[in-house]
Amino acid sequence: MNQDPAETRDTAAPPPADTTSPSPVSPELEPRSAPGAQDIDAASASLTVDEDDEARLPEIDDDSAEVADGPLAVGRAAIEQAVRLAPTSPGVYRMLNAADDVLYVGKAKNVKKRLSSYARPTGHVVRIARMIAATVTVEIISTATETEALLLEANLIKQLRPRFNVLLRDDKSFPYILITGDHWAPQILKHRGAQSRPGRYFGPFASVGAVNRTITALQRAFLVRSCTDSFFESRTRPCLLYQIRRCAGPCTGEVDFPGYTELVREATDFLSGRSRAVKQELAVEMEKASNELEFETAALYRDRLAALSAIQSQQGINPRTVEEADVFAIHQEGGYSCVEVFFFRTGQNWGNRAYFPRAEKSFTPEEVLASFLAQFYDDKPPPKLILLSHDIEECELLANALCIKAGRKVEVAAPKRGEKKELVAHALTNAREALGRKLADTATQTRLMQGLATTLGLPRPPQRIEVYDNSHIQGTNAVGAMIVAGPDGFIKNQYRKFNIRSEGLTPGDDYAMMREVLQRRFKRLAAAKAEGDAAKPKEDDTPLWPDLVIIDGGRGQLNAARGVLTELGLGAEVTLLGVAKGPDRDAGRETLFMPEREAIKLEPRDPVLYFIQRLRDEAHRFVIGSHRKLRKKDIREAGLQEIPGIGPTRKRALLHHFGTLKEIERASIGDLGKVPGISAESARRIFDFFHPGPG
């Protein structure tokens, strides 16, 4: 829900596909584009991103500027025109500027009455006056109910990201733990996305790290396999996980079907909240084994109990009276907002995460929280209970909308006493601390950017830094990569990798590889600029055109990059910096190169140098990871490359079915023919390739 800036405030919630009218959005309401160093402590010069938090604080518009009467009158006239045609029924409205950018999306029980409040000549706060002054068009869609309007409003806000709405940022899906249900020996794995595979899903967890740690501990406690089905089917002896007691070895019959089924049941019970009963069962078995002098078995049960205790110790608070709930708390400071979310499922704490929604300074905590909730649950199933730190307007309307989405009752409340109040207070403390850390990190990053600009002689601190590197082994599996950093840290959703495509490259020709990467990147960027799109910011307000391009290499790499930009007519528009490693590749002894300037040497403890090293190392980490994936794929498919008529799709099908190249080689013609997409002729060709006849 996004709070309406007029007399009455709106709420919004996520629209399920079956709750809107048959034509919920008219053709004219299809989504549109949104508008778009010396005193630094060296220890603070590193860019860090907590996986549980957003990486960046949003840009906050200055709402103190007065609005001229002329534009305000024009905007009111446009709104008055819309009022004359507006219905008195529920609906959603959108305000657009002269460039056809959506400024604001709102909903109302009575659209005509709501729009009339904007047409008043006086009584608006500066933020609303600025919005009215920029408005030239108002679009309206009627809905059957106010709840339907609320759902549609939240959906449109997430799609269009209007400037004057509260915007949820970095809204990626949460990871779950899945115990599969489509194999006789269920697998435990991390899952993100649509829950289409049969099995039991547990979560959401606040971060991938929390899921990975929990799965590792669950493997130690319950010995449930984590391997893929194809790997499972290809085993002829137990793998390493069996040897280190993190799997029971069902693949090779080390445990029988009833025994493995019991392990899976215990794991499911533990994740379902019956942890005390599971621990009691294991304790009884440990005592029994000890009494029977089976000390090795008793030690195994002891280790499993310790793994369960480790999981629970990581969860921190585990409420006694709350079975399934999400807890939201908001704290505002310095014009920014932080919403901390805790997830409780089956009476267990599955972690927490901090969000920093984009909202103008004049929004109250209640307004930001209400709008945040609607967008948050747009693509997530709501729990039975939602606890809030602040009372929000139209709380009942939001609860009704979430009930429609979930197909069951959803309660939304701001508790005043008891354990629920304590949970909210704990979340509020975390929100306050998270925002404090983020403000401090942002201030440090700002000083680093200023120091970098001073050191390199830039006209202003860079808003977008791109760093390039490439990786290969004697020219094979060559890949280039670009990472992006801004005033608030790394912007990982804008990282890019480039598979080197040029034929005839001399193996190991780093200059040619860098030229190809930069040509592909800046040709695309120059084309976008010619069309007028390159200057427009992305959703997170980061400009698309870099202020500084850093190349991992010395003067030669720098000249190669400069040549590419000159060929494209961009030589004067991009600042280049080459970073050459020191003697013996020692950190702290790097040399910096810029076109037509003497080499720059910084003191080893200079925070600006440390900052540049961190940027270079992040690019190196990213490109090495991309190269390893390519190499792993190449090694895995080695041996299938030479079979005529077997392309990438069939290779993947064969490897998915058999797991390894050795199993493909062992397969009979009949087994090969069972693979989806492999015809009888292809099966014969594959078999003959691995089993050539005499002569």
UniProtKB/Swiss-Prot annotation:
Interacts with UvrB in an incision complex. HAMAP family: UvrC. Residues 88-166 form the GIY-YIG domain. This is UvrABC system protein C. NCBIfam families: PRK00558.1-5 (NF001824), uvrC (TIGR00194). Residues 18-27 have a biased composition (Low complexity). InterPro entries: GIY-YIG_endonuc, GIY-YIG_endonuc_sf, GIY-YIG_UvrC_Cho, Hlx-hairpin-Hlx_DNA-bd_motif, RuvA_2-like, UVR_dom, UVR_dom_sf, UvrABC_protein_C. Belongs to the UvrC family. It comes from the Bacteria. The gene is uvrC. It is found in: Cytoplasm. Residues 1-10 have a biased composition (Basic and acidic residues). Residues 276-311 form the UVR domain. The UvrABC repair system catalyzes the recognition and processing of DNA lesions. UvrC both incises the 5' and 3' sides of the lesion. The N-terminal half is responsible for the 3' incision and the C-terminal half is responsible for the 5' incision. Signal peptide: none annotated. Transmembrane segments: none annotated.
